[in-house]
């Protein structure tokens, strides 16, 4: 008898509500016979905030924690000041659920046009540390709005936090092309950079089959557009990862075919999977949004739960659909139906 997994579903705002159901349908079809899913929907996002001022009520967060994984659609609304939902919902979940790996695959599918003249075979993944660095909220400001104002942002890197994400990267590389590239700026950020390098060297000794090298962040951004096929697993910190993942999305043709995961690799808390596109309020409710990225986020969820064969069904169906029909104009529902029909 197949095990039942509990999935927290946060459709969010805009097109998130339209694409998330297709991720759920893909989950169910791909895992048919090997896993069952029980969903709990959460009304969180811009619409909820505008309605009653709630961002992430404590009782709802506790219910989310009781699930095996989280599917997120998209969150955002131009009526809300930037940073409110990002910090109050997305970052709060990431930190409270200790989702210390931000995983962003980047693959150029046949049928998708890259902005690069000669992109080559692009298929790499960025492993970004997700709970430390400059995004952990350390810092402050004094004498605001005066000529003497001082503002600081403090980057915090711990050996514990770095080592666990380094180990994740090497384990992932063993399933791929067995190469890890550390990206940092250790010639300037000498304290953090040195610690990252030493830990990579130490962990690398435990994985003799995996080669590893190093690039400064500025060099890496150049190689991402001049020779992206050289990369397999890119390992980096929170800030540099934020920059590289956006660039990575652009070289494979944009956000329409890209998903990401915020991973708690210890499984102490649920991990969260989502398309990287936004809520796109300009096309919301018009059945125009492409659900492919949301469906790919379902594949990442299956991989995280250990159902690699089921995830492969989704990947194979998506690749075939994009190659044959990716350039055609289709509705949200038609794209979803076409992909599911190939599974």
Curated annotation (Swiss-Prot):
One Pfam family recorded for the sequence: Iso_dh
Cofactor list:
Mg(2+); Mn(2+)
The record lists substrate as bound by 94, 104, 128, 218
A GO CC annotation given for this chain: cytoplasm
Cellular compartment(s) = Cytoplasm
EC no. given is: 1.1.1.85
Q: Which InterPro entries match?
A: ICDH/IPMDH, IsoPropMal-DH-like_dom, LeuB_actb
Site (Important for catalysis) residue list: 135, 185
The residues that hold Mg(2+) are 218, 242, 246
Record keyword NAD present: yes
GO terms for molecular function, please?
A: 3-isopropylmalate dehydrogenase activity; metal ion binding
Main localization of the protein described in the UniProt heading: cytoplasm
Q: How the cofactor binds, per note?
A: Binds 1 Mg(2+) or Mn(2+) ion per subunit.
Q: In which pathway does it act?
A: Amino-acid biosynthesis; L-leucine biosynthesis; L-leucine from 3-methyl-2-oxobutanoate: step 3/4
Positions that bind NAD(+): 278-290
The reaction(s) this protein catalyses:
(2R,3S)-3-isopropylmalate + NAD(+) = 4-methyl-2-oxopentanoate + CO2 + NADH
* Record flagged with keyword Oxidoreductase: yes
Enumerate the Gene Ontology biological process terms. L-leucine biosynthetic process
Keywords from the UniProt entry: Amino-acid biosynthesis, Branched-chain amino acid biosynthesis, Cytoplasm, Leucine biosynthesis, Magnesium, Manganese, Metal-binding, NAD, Oxidoreductase
**Which protein family is named in the record?**
Belongs to the isocitrate and isopropylmalate dehydrogenases family. LeuB type 2 subfamily.
Its annotated function is as follows: Catalyzes the oxidation of 3-carboxy-2-hydroxy-4-methylpentanoate (3-isopropylmalate) to 3-carboxy-4-methyl-2-oxopentanoate. The product decarboxylates to 4-methyl-2 oxopentanoate.
HAMAP family, sorted: LeuB_type2
Subunit info here reads:
Homodimer.
Name of the featured protein: 3-isopropylmalate dehydrogenase
């Amino acid at each position: 008898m197949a095990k039942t997994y509990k999935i927290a579903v946060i459709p969010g705002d805009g097109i998130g509500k339209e694409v998330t159901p297709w991720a759920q349908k893909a989950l169910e079809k791909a895992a048919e016979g090997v896993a069952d899913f029980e969903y709990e929907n959460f009304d969180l996002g811009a619409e909820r905030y505008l309605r009653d001022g709630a961002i992430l009520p404590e009782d709802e967060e506790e219910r989310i924690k009781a699930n095996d994984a989280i599917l997120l659609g998209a969150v955002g609304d131009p009526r809300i000041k930037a940073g409110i939902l990002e910090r109050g919902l997305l970052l709060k979940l990431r930190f409270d659920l200790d989702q210390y790996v931000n995983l962003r695959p980047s693959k150029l599918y046949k049928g998708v046009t890259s902005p690069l003249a000669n992109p080559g075979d692009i298929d790499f993944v960025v492993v970004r540390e997700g709970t430390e660095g400059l995004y952990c909220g350390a810092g402050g400001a004094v004498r605001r709005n005066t000529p003497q104002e001082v503002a600081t942002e403090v980057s915090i890197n711990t050996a514990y936090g770095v080592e666990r994400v380094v180990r994740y990267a090497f384990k992932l590389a063993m399933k791929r092309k067995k190469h890890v590239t550390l990206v940092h700026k250790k010639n300037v950020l000498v304290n953090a950079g040195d610690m990252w390098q030493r830990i990579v060297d130490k962990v690398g000794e435990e994985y003799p089959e995996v080669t590893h090298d190093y690039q400064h962040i500025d060099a890496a951004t150049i190689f991402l557009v001049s020779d992206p096929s050289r990369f397999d697993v890119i390992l980096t910190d929170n800030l540099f990862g934020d920059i590289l993942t956006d660039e990575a999305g652009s070289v494979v043709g944009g956000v329409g075919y890209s998903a990401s995961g915020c991973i708690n690799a210890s499984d102490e808390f649920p991990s969260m999977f989502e398309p990287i596109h936004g809520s796109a309020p300009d096309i919301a409710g018009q059945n125009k949004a492409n659900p492919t990225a949301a469906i790919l986020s379902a594949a990442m969820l299956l991989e995280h739960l250990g159902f690699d064969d089921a995830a492969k069904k989704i990947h194979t169906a998506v690749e075939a659909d994009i190659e044959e029909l990716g350039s055609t104009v289709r509705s949200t529902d038609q794209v979803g139906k076409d992909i599911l029909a190939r599974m």
